[in-house]
Amino acid sequence: MAYAFKKNGLLKPFVSTAAICLLVAGTVVLCHASGGGEGAHHVDTGKQMKDFMWRVIDFIALAGVIVWALKKANAKGALADRSANVEKALREAEEARTAAEKKFAEYSEKLEKANQEIDGIYAAIRKEGELEKERIIAEARITAEKIREQATATATQEVLKARAELRDEAARLAVQMAEQALREAIKKDDQDRLVSEYLTKVENLH
């Protein structure tokens, strides 16, 4: 029992209570001893003292039990407080976990939206690049067609110009050759005759 009291921290209160009870018992014994000096009452006094001592022991045991019960009640209260603190800590931890999960869900949603926006921007850029590529190709085709048409027109003009120059040169050569042939065909006498006929015609006109 003493070990149980010591283990639960009740030994000092129990010893203090026992000391008080023994002090009271000693005081009572002294009072009985001083008041009962006659031999006839010695046997009764011894029985009374023995009975009183048992009462004191019972009282001490009862007091110890009471002290132990009070201490245990305090221990239960402390345990209850500790349990409440543990429950509070667990509740706060659960709330913190819930808040963290909520934050994680929010950030995950924001990250997903950001990824979708990035994908959309990338798709728009790629589409814009394809449209720009098609536009450049179309402009290049138009430019090439214009250059081809311009080259064709220029070539046609050059051909026509060359043909005209060839015709002019051919005509000039033809005239020159005709004159040369005519000169060679007309003789000196024919020239004199032609001049004489021409002069006669002029005179007749006057």
From Swiss-Prot:
Top-level division of the source organism's lineage: Bacteria
UniProt key word Ribosomal protein: no
Pfam families per the UniProt record, alphabetical: ATP-synt_B
Family to which the UniProt record says this protein belongs: Belongs to the ATPase B chain family.
Subcellular location(s) of the protein: Cell inner membrane
Keywords, ordered alphabetically: ATP synthesis, Cell inner membrane, Cell membrane, CF(0), Hydrogen ion transport, Ion transport, Membrane, Transmembrane, Transmembrane helix, Transport
TM helices/strands, residue ranges: 10-30
Family annotation (PANTHER family): ATP SYNTHASE SUBUNIT B, CHLOROPLASTIC (PTHR34264:SF3)
Function: F(1)F(0) ATP synthase produces ATP from ADP in the presence of a proton or sodium gradient. F-type ATPases consist of two structural domains, F(1) containing the extramembraneous catalytic core and F(0) containing the membrane proton channel, linked together by a central stalk and a peripheral stalk. During catalysis, ATP synthesis in the catalytic domain of F(1) is coupled via a rotary mechanism of the central stalk subunits to proton translocation. Component of the F(0) channel, it forms part of the peripheral stalk, linking F(1) to F(0).
Gene: atpF
CDD domains in the record: ATP-synt_Fo_b
HAMAP family in the cross-refs: ATP_synth_b_bprime (MF_01398)
Gene Ontology terms, MF aspect: proton-transporting ATP synthase activity, rotational mechanism
Membrane topology, as annotated: Single-pass membrane protein
InterPro entries: ATP_synth_b/b'su_bac/chlpt (IPR002146)
Assembly: F-type ATPases have 2 components, F(1) - the catalytic core - and F(0) - the membrane proton channel. F(1) has five subunits: alpha(3), beta(3), gamma(1), delta(1), epsilon(1). F(0) has three main subunits: a(1), b(2) and c(10-14). The alpha and beta chains form an alternating ring which encloses part of the gamma chain. F(1) is attached to F(0) by a central stalk formed by the gamma and epsilon chains, while a peripheral stalk is formed by the delta and b chains.
GO cellular component: plasma membrane; proton-transporting ATP synthase complex
Name of the protein in question: ATP synthase subunit b
Main location as per UniProt: membrane
